[in-house]
């Protein structure tokens, strides 16, 4: 599972890794924040959410305000927590730092928090991102320019 306020995986290597994992049968979940402290971030995520859904990747939108955590949990064995958003700026431009944790006791304490965040989220469907209002479609086009 990947928790990120911004889901804009423009980087082809990162996108390919997600898709390849899914093709290998890995259950990939993305939890992002549709409510953001940054302009047009939700709209910039729409094309990637559409692509993720077509690849069988589950996408969830956090309902209880702004989700600002950056967490990756892999097979309940590796936890990554830090400052990296799931976007090209974090991967290539900003100075970011993550901590990799493999301590099963620590992970077992964090997992329920992640599960609670998922429970406080709505699973995104194709119709959610394909039946946008005219206003949202326009915002998506503008977001694409600045991505």
Annotate the PLM regions.
Residues 6-147:
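PLD/PLD-like phosphodiesterase catalytic module centered on the HKD motif
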